[in-house]
């Protein structure tokens, strides 16, 4: 009977060691999964940062050229407005004199299509 008891004890100890090994294996697996998840998250973050930086550089290049274009258009518009204002100042008196001459200098005459019925 003692040998049976000793055999049972050995079986229980072997079962306990097997359960400990299984538990350790599960813990190692959980740690590996957690580590793999963290590494994957870091890779995703790094990729996202790279793509964001690439997008920002492309956006800056596109917006930079648009900024230059808008500045050039603004400057050209100012030059045209200044040219129109100077032209208006130069021609103002002459145009006013012409307009007043046409309005005030009335020459009455019979229209060529008018027929005198007699």
Swiss-Prot record:
It is a peripheral membrane protein. GO terms for molecular function: ATP hydrolysis activity; proton-transporting ATPase activity, rotational mechanism. Residues 35-55 have a biased composition (Basic and acidic residues). Pfam families: V-ATPase_G. Its main location: other. Keywords: Cytoplasmic vesicle, Hydrogen ion transport, Ion transport, Membrane, Transport. It is found in: Melanosome; Cytoplasmic vesicle, Clathrin-coated vesicle membrane. The keyword Membrane applies. Residues 23-90 are annotated as: Disordered. It comes from the Eukaryota. GO terms for cellular component: clathrin-coated vesicle membrane; melanosome; synaptic vesicle membrane; vacuolar proton-transporting V-type ATPase, V1 domain. GO terms for biological process: synaptic vesicle lumen acidification. Residues 56-69, 78-89 have a biased composition (Polar residues). PANTHER family: V-TYPE PROTON ATPASE SUBUNIT G 2, VACUOLAR ATP SYNTHASE SUBUNIT G. Belongs to the V-ATPase G subunit family. Subunit of the V1 complex of vacuolar(H+)-ATPase (V-ATPase), a multisubunit enzyme composed of a peripheral complex (V1) that hydrolyzes ATP and a membrane integral complex (V0) that translocates protons. V-ATPase is responsible for acidifying and maintaining the pH of intracellular compartments and in some cell types, is targeted to the plasma membrane, where it is responsible for acidifying the extracellular environment. V-ATPase is a heteromultimeric enzyme made up of two complexes: the ATP-hydrolytic V1 complex and the proton translocation V0 complex. The V1 complex consists of three catalytic AB heterodimers that form a heterohexamer, three peripheral stalks each consisting of EG heterodimers, one central rotor including subunits D and F, and the regulatory subunits C and H. The proton translocation complex V0 consists of the proton transport subunit a, a ring of proteolipid subunits c9c'', rotary subunit d, subunits e and f, and the accessory subunits ATP6AP1/Ac45 and ATP6AP2/PRR. This is V-type proton ATPase subunit G 2. It comes from Macaca mulatta (Rhesus macaque). The lineage of its organism: Eukaryota, Metazoa, Chordata, Craniata, Vertebrata. The gene is ATP6V1G2.
């Amino acid at each position: 009977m003692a040998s049976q008891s000793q055999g049972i004890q050995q079986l229980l100890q072997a079962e306990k060691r097997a359960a400990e090994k299984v538990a350790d294996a599960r813990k190692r697996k959980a740690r590996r999964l957690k580590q793999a998840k963290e590494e994957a998250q870091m890779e995703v973050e790094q990729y996202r940062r790279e793509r964001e930086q690439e997008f920002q550089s492309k956006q800056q290049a596109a917006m930079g050229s648009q900024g230059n274009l808008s500045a050039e258009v603004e400057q050209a518009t100012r030059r045209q407005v200044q040219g129109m204002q100077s032209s208006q100042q130069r021609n103002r008196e002459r145009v006013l004199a012409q307009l007043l001459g046409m309005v005030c200098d009335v020459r009455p005459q019979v229209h060529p299509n008018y027929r005198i019925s007699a």
